[in-house]
Swiss-Prot record:
Keywords: Glycosyltransferase, Plant defense, Transferase. UDP-alpha-D-glucose binds at A356, Q358, H373, W376, N377, S378, E381, E397, Q398. It is an enzyme of class 2 (transferase). Its EC number is 2.4.1.-, 2.4.1.91. GO terms for molecular function: flavonol 3-O-glucosyltransferase activity; quercetin 3-O-glucosyltransferase activity; UDP-glucosyltransferase activity. InterPro entries: UDP_glucos_trans, UDP_glycos_trans_CS. SUPFAM superfamilies: UDP-Glycosyltransferase/glycogen phosphorylase (SSF53756). Belongs to the UDP-glycosyltransferase family. Induction: Induced by pathogen infection, H(2)O(2) and salicylic acid. Disruption phenotype: Decreased resistance to avirulent strains of P.syringae. This is UDP-glycosyltransferase 73B5.
């Protein structure tokens, strides 16, 4: 498209303050910057530190492109939050008995930034505001100042369609128990789920009322940006545009906007392993022989569950890289590991505490499977890397994403999770071992691997010039230009 015209576009990107929301929004800001727009990320002081290094590196590599940060004040203590509570990951590691209440308080406190947002919009007069779904108040701010507001959910078309049809048809009200399976009505394909898995927010709860606000603000917004590509879930992209949100652009996989090795390594928090050391370890392994396990930035397993995973991995006989997050009450020691586990798996297993350079690892030829919690960032990163997956959903919309991976795309093997992780049901070592064996070398492993590889190729083609996501970015930018 015309480079001079596109340079006039200035887009504000306002992510919810949590790693899983910030990472794809940073990718998106870089993507639009590469396509000639000026990108400005809006965030708070502590979160700005997470953005600074990757943005600085991006600017050094692309000196002609425009991308920056605007910091909003967020006085935690004044807002009734603990000191330093500027990110939802703080709450996940906080792990006090009232952490659920703290999350809600954090969610509602973000409205404190509304006035700062409006002042900044008035001053800069941007072409558009891309704001996270968790900022429903942003629609009103943007509308008041004549700026189109785009919603970013950070999930798949498929899960958005599932959520919509669950709300419209309420099939969970027509079954005997919360664990009774039913088909979600009105969707392409027979998608079977239970109320426990669908994780429907009760409408009368504070979270239920908040989600109603989210939906209303979405209805009044300019449209929706989705981190997916058309070929992956075309039937659901079409359904979404026909029945849910008339205006939606697919612009993913966003993780593919990280092209350089350093960009992939620096994505998110500072990794707890040197990337060169990690790559050297992977280089020593046979292609497709290593299983990678990571459960997102919001999952903390109990010591009992960590022990079962360890036994399951050892029993599978597979080489592995395992990213382990624990909350502050569990300490840094590894007493949860089976006795002698480290010695028995020396050279075969790598345990990374906290944060790992995930995209860098997934892209390595030694990786043959990905054990994931089915958060959409991880799922789409696994798809873009062309990998089959072991699905272990924990909460949020993750059971929907699992259905997409296992039933629609057929590149996933279910570990056996049937309800939200907070209910405390353990996945046994036998289940872990069976799923890991199946994804790497089971009866249908080759067929699954070939199809996953094909999807990975389609993902990469989607973001190249002429691809479906590349073209949708064009359409979106042309629409913004047309408003001038």
């Amino acid at each position: 498209m015309n480079r001079e015209v596109s340079e006039r576009i200035h887009i504000l990107f306002f992510p919810f303050m949590a790693q899983g929301h910030m990472i794809p929004i940073l990718d998106m800001a870089k993507l639009f910057s590469r396509r000639g727009a000026k990108s400005t990320l809006l965030t708070t002081p502590i979160n700005a530190k997470i953005f600074e290094k990757p943005i600085e590196a991006f600017k050094n590599q692309n000196p002609d492109l425009e991308i920056g940060i605007k910091i909003f004040n967020f006085p935690c203590v004044e807002l009734g939050l603990p000191e330093g509570c500027e990110n939802a990951d703080f709450i996940n590691s906080y792990q006090k008995s009232d952490s659920g209440d703290l999350f809600l308080k954090f969610l509602f406190s973000t409205k404190y930034m509304k006035q700062q947002l409006e002042s900044f919009i008035e001053t800069t007069k941007p072409s558009a505001l891309v704001a996270d779904m968790f900022f429903p108040w942003a629609t009103e701010s943007a509308e008041k100042l004549g700026v189109p507001r785009l919603v970013f959910h950070g999930t798949s078309f498929f899960s958005l369609c599932c959520s919509y049809n669950m709300r419209i048809h309420k099939p969970h009200k027509k079954v005997a128990t919360s664990s009774t399976p039913f088909v979600i009505p009105g969707l392409p394909g027979d998608i079977v789920i239970t109320e426990d898995q669908a994780n429907v927010a009760k409408e009368e709860t504070p979270m239920g009322k908040f989600m109603k606000e989210v939906r209303e603000s979405e209805t009044n917004s300019f449209g929706v940006l989705v981190n997916s590509f058309y070929e992956l879930e075309s039937a659901y992209a079409d359904f979404y545009r026909s029945f849910v949100a008339k205006r939606a652009w697919h612009i993913g996989p966003l993780s593919l906007s990280n092209r350089e090795l350093g960009e992939k390594a620096r994505r998110g928090k500072k990794a707890n392993i040197d990337e060169q050391e990690c790559l050297k370890w992977l280089d020593s392994k046979t292609p497709g022989s290593v299983v990678y396990l990571s459960f997102g930035s919001g999952t903390n397993f109990t010591n009992d569950q960590l022990l079962e995973i360890a036994f399951g991995l050892e029993g599978s006989g597979q080489s592995f890289i395992w990213v382990v997050r624990k909350n502050e009450n569990q300490g840094d020691n590894e007493e949860w590991l089976p006795e002698g586990f480290k010695e028995r798996t020396t050279g075969k297993g790598l345990i990374i505490p906290g944060w790992a350079p995930q995209v860098l690892i997934l892209d390595h030829k030694a990786i043959g499977g990905f054990v994931t919690h089915c958060g959409w960032n991880s799922a789409i990163e696994g798809i873009a890397a062309g990998l089959p997956m072991v699905t272990w959903p924990m909460g949020a919309e993750q059971f929907y994403n699992e259905k997409l991976l296992t039933k629609v795309l057929r590149i996933g093997v279910n570990v056996g999770a049937t309800e939200l992780v907070k209910k405390g049901k353990l996945i046994s070592r036998a289940q872990v071992e069976k799923a890991v064996r199946e994804v790497i070398g089971g009866e249908k492993a080759e067929e699954r691997r070939l199809w996953a590889k094909k999807l990975g190729e389609m993902a990469k083609a989607a973001v190249e010039e002429g691809g479906s996501s590349y073209n949708d970015v064009n359409k979106f930018m042309e629409e913004l230009n047309g408003r001038k």
